[in-house]
């Protein structure tokens, strides 16, 4: 908190009660299934965060599954060069894990509201979710490219990990996440919006100095980071502004940032991305098959064990859910 790029009046004076754990989940339900988040940070109330603290949980086996579920073909297609590809292969998973941890633990826990300012859901309204996710992302990005990570023993090569993380964030925010959208659609989901407005604003902010370069080669578009140090400064500048928006409850600034950079999609690039992605069979979103957990009881009904059995397929799971738990009345 003390070393972040936030304005002094927006920094917590006394950071308390920040805890972090990684757990493996046996199954999920509700809005966490079949497509799940990779981490959870609570509480949502900022006054509780300020006075008591916050707790973060990363879902370790979920992160591992996401990282190992796809091939490297899509990366090869959208990475600008061999260096970007090799950095992602060697350091990308660790960079992603660290970004998730920094996002959840430090990002959501950082900063404070100005006295008398309401909760973001009241002041920033429909932009509160994407603004908060972007703010947490930016805090993580700001510290991902820093030697302190190596001093703490978290990485062996902080610069390579940071470069891989920055490459991946820009590549996803400006290109690869667009495979989830139909051509002509706006970006609606809060996390997708925040990744786009963070990336697009940073690209625009550094355009004069060519910090991030748009490369056209053989009819394809790529993005290449020419100056990682400068990009970190830009992330810090945007972090400072997003915290100001939250701390002051500046709805107009949030609206301008999100609508200006996070909603509309460059249709020409979008069409190109979808065309280049046609060669890959992997789905745009990941879904999970939950095991069936059956209690094993003794003659008195006491549970002695749990039998874990996986169903035949994702499709079978969803049909069984509809059969057993589809309680909505159909006309």
Each language-model region and where it sits:
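Active-site-adjacent bridging/hinge elements
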Residues: 70-82, 104-119
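Long, well-structured alpha-helical subdomains associated
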Residues: 141-245, 251
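Non-catalytic terminal regions of proteins
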Residues: 1-37, 215-331
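Short, glycine/acidic-rich hinge or "gate" loops at secondary-structure transitions
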Residues: 5-10, 118-123, 149-167, 253-258
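An active-site-proximal "capping" alpha-helix that borders the catalytic cofactor pocket
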Residues: 129-146
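Active-site recognition of the HExxH zinc-binding catalytic motif
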Residues: 95-112, 136-137, 141
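Contiguous, non-catalytic segments that form substrate-binding/exosite surfaces or channel walls
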Residues: 1-86, 92
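Post-HEXXH active-site segment of zinc metalloproteases
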Residues: 111-134
């Amino acid at each position: 908190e003390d070393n972040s790029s936030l304005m002094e009046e927006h920094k917590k004076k006394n950071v308390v009660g920040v805890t972090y754990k990684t757990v493996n989940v046996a199954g999920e339900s509700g809005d966490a299934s079949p497509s799940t988040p990779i981490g959870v940070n609570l509480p949502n109330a900022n006054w509780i965060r300020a006075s008591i603290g916050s707790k973060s949980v990363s879902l370790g086996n979920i992160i591992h599954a996401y990282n190992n579920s796809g091939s490297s073909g899509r990366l090869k297609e959208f990475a600008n060069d061999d260096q970007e590809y090799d950095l992602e292969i060697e350091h990308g998973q660790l960079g992603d894990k660290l970004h998730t941890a920094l996002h959840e633990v430090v990002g959501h826990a950082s900063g404070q509201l100005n006295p008398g300012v309401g909760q973001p859901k009241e002041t920033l309204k429909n932009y509160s979710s994407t603004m908060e996710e972007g703010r947490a992302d930016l805090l993580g990005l700001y510290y991902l490219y820093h030697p302190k990570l190596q001093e703490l023993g978290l990485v062996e090569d902080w610069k390579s990990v940071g470069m891989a993380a920055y490459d991946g964030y820009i590549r996803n925010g400006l290109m690869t996440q667009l495979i989830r959208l139909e051509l002509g659609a706006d970006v609606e989901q809060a996390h997708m919006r925040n990744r786009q407005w963070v990336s697009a604003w940073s690209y625009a902010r550094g355009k004069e100095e060519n910090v991030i370069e748009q490369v056209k080669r053989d009819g394809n578009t790529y993005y290449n980071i020419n100056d990682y140090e400068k990009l970190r400064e830009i992330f810090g500048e945007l972090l400072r502004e997003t915290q100001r928006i939250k701390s002051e409850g500046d709805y107009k600034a949030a609206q301008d940032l999100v609508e200006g950079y996070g909603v509309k999609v460059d249709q020409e690039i979008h069409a190109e991305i979808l065309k280049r992605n046609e060669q890959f069979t992997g789905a745009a979103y990941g879904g999970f098959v939950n095991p069936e957990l059956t209690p094993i009881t003794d003659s008195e009904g006491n549970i002695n064990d749990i039998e874990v059995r996986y169903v035949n397929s994702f499709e079978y799971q969803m049909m069984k859910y509809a059969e057993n738990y589809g309680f909505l009345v159909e006309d």
